[in-house]
Amino acid sequence: MTNIRKTHPLLKIINSSFVDLPAPSSLSSWWNFGSLLGVCLAVQILTGLFLAMHYTSDTATAFNSVTHICRDVNYGWLLRYLHANGASMFFICLYLHVGRGLYYGSYTYSETWNIGILLLFAVMATAFMGYVLP
């Protein structure tokens, strides 16, 4: 008797996409960090955009605007903490993503590896200019 998931027309499509997915055996949880980087980047952009709506960079009122965000804006404290901890999570995922590439020998694909290193340096320079210097 054949399995219904392999004979039914609709279930056959779902089975071939999710259950019997043709994936290499070396695919492990280390391969999730690329998509986690995308999620962290989206969270950083969205929370940064919403925080920038209420922040003033004037030296006399900057601290007051941060307290305004935390106290008066709906879930402003959550936006601030998501943005701060999201940056740390972004760099953790970034370093683990590069570490996975080193472990599996992705540096042999020189063009892809060099583009990734340029992106890594661009992210580090952006973080330095935006978070460390001010």
From Swiss-Prot:
GO terms for cellular component: mitochondrial inner membrane. It comes from Chiroderma salvini (Salvin's big-eyed bat). It is a multi-pass membrane protein. Its cofactor is heme b. Keywords: Electron transport, Heme, Iron, Membrane, Metal-binding, Mitochondrion, Mitochondrion inner membrane, Respiratory chain, Transmembrane, Transmembrane helix, Transport, Ubiquinone. Heme b b566 binds at residue 97. This is Cytochrome b. It comes from the Eukaryota. GO terms for molecular function: metal ion binding; ubiquinol-cytochrome-c reductase activity. The keyword Electron transport applies.
